Amino acid sequence: LMAYDVLIKGGRIYDGSGLPSYLGDVAVQDGRIVDTGRINGSAKRVVNADGLAVSPGFIDFHTHLDAQLLWDPLATSSCYHGVTTVIPGNCGLSLAPCKEPDRDTILKSFERVEAITLPALRAGVKWGFTTFGQYLDALRGKLGVNVASLVGHCALRQFVMGEASIERAATPAEIHQMKEVLKASV
């Protein structure tokens, strides 16, 4: 008889495979699902899921949580709904790379797509990063969700071209510089 860390008993399991849901149990060991079905075993913690749905965490492929993650590392607007992985940096928006003179320009782009005012963004984003890697370092070790962030093309253009990024096409030299900044970011 196997002993698990967690045993979720009697829930309706939606496993993400596309197959119909089924009543069963989920065994977790060392933070990973190790078995599903009708499980005869013991656990340090048993969760009664009778009448409840059980599923893997959801992935939100389209978020603008780049700023919010700095003051809300649980991403409560997502994790309270079963989301365990978020992908910020969508629609070309990301907080980094960003030079100090461009910070308000970048924050204003978030104000336009999020229901967060510019004063709230200014108060919530504690700058201390310029590069995308430094932004990721600012998040590291604090998050309650998995984060796989994209490098926003608007931030990349602003980083290389400044205000000209919204006025004209990039030159071949600027495109080359953007490629180098992007390579350093991923």
Regions found by a protein language model. Name each.
Residues 46, 66, 97-98:
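Short Asp/Glu-rich motifs
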Residues 7, 27, 60, 87, ...:
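Structured core elements
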Residues 53-77:
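Di-metal (Zn2+ and/or Mg2+/Mn2+) metal-binding site signature of metallo-dependent hydrolases
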Residues 18-19, 59, 70, 161:
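Short capping/connector residues at structural and topological boundaries
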Residues 2-7, 13-57:
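Histidine-rich, glycine-flanked metal-binding segment
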